[in-house]
Amino acid sequence: YALTETGSWRYEIIEDIIENNSKLLNDFRVKNYMIHGLSDKYSEISYMITEELKKQTKEIVPLLKDDFDPQGKREMIYRLDIISSLCKEEENDFYKYCIENGSKEIKEIAIGALKYSQDNIDYILDLTKTEKGKLKNKAFEVLSYMSDDRAVKEWDKFFKKKPFENI
């Protein structure tokens, strides 16, 4: 009931289950409830569940992608964070889908996930030109993970424009 009901008493129960009954968390049905718990109104519970789901295997990814809404709020941000943590570059197409269709918050997480594949250099370079503000800064951050001379050149241009604002 701790994953489906409301009330502050649930935090300790969920925490106890995570710390002491890890075998219970391997039950496929419980994983569905945990994913549902990502939308919990208590952010501490959502965060705790997110961190636990990041320790699971990739078999939960289809559950996380089921009914995924790139325009969604906190629950979808947690889902995307878990997917990128588990799958790294394997879900590269999904990250691009989220960038093209997502809310600003979803886009930011998805842009961050592009760092896992060196093949994303052209896509990231495009983002540094098309995105603005926080998303542009995130694209430049991810560009720092790329081992390509073009990334270095783009960073040089970035700092030459407004050196103190870009630090």
Predicted feature residues:
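Structural detector for internal amphipathic alpha-helices that build alpha-solenoid repeat scaffolds
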Residues: E5, W9-L25, H36, I45-Q56, ...
